[in-house]
Amino acid sequence: MLQPKRTKYRKVHKGRNEGLSWSANAVSFGEYGLKATAHGQLTARQIEAARRSISRYVKRGGKMWIRVFPDKPITKKPIEVRMGSGKGNVEYWVAQIQPGRMIYEIEGVTEDVAREAFRLAAAKLSVTTTFVTRTVR
């Protein structure tokens, strides 16, 4: 699964996930893309599960790009531990997603195959998505 090799700080504040995605909001590498239409967080497990479903469906054809990376640590305290005594340990990693963010891109397959592969992948993700096509080469 995806996670940073090293970070400047082990734990981060919760923060807010507002606004629209101003970067990575167009199909840049492939021919077709899966674009987020809502705010949310994608865990490393969700990103990997969706990647597997895409690559299993397209088999050996096509090339895929993952446009998101889980770089935010989410902490959790152990079960039955009283409140206080500091922040919990890092449990998993997430990528924060804004509307308009491109999540996956693919090329080298027909539109029908790409559409079905992204439909299967979208079922594994916790944000609503839409299928987009590259407009300008």
UniProtKB/Swiss-Prot annotation:
The record's section on PROSITE patterns has: RIBOSOMAL_L16_1 (PS00586), RIBOSOMAL_L16_2 (PS00701)
Q: Give a yes or no for keyword Ribosomal protein in this entry.
A: yes
Any one Pfam family here would be Ribosomal_L16
From the UniProt annotation, give the residues forming the signal peptide. Answer: none
> Could you tell me the superkingdom of the organism this chain comes from?
Bacteria
Residue pairs linked by disulfide bridges in the UniProt entry: none
GO terms under cellular component: cytosolic large ribosomal subunit
| Protein keywords | Ribonucleoprotein, Ribosomal protein, RNA-binding, rRNA-binding, tRNA-binding
Q: Does the keyword Lipoprotein apply?
A: no
Show the GO MF annotations: rRNA binding; structural constituent of ribosome; tRNA binding
| Biological processes per GO annotation | translation
Q: Which family does it belong to?
A: Belongs to the universal ribosomal protein uL16 family.
Query: Subunit structure, briefly?
Result: Part of the 50S ribosomal subunit.
Question: What exactly does this protein do?
Answer: Binds 23S rRNA and is also seen to make contacts with the A and possibly P site tRNAs.
Record's protein name: Large ribosomal subunit protein uL16
Tell me which species this is from: Stenotrophomonas maltophilia (strain R551-3)
For this protein's source organism, the top of the classification is:
Bacteria, Pseudomonadati, Pseudomonadota, Gammaproteobacteria, Lysobacterales
Gene name of the encoded protein: rplP
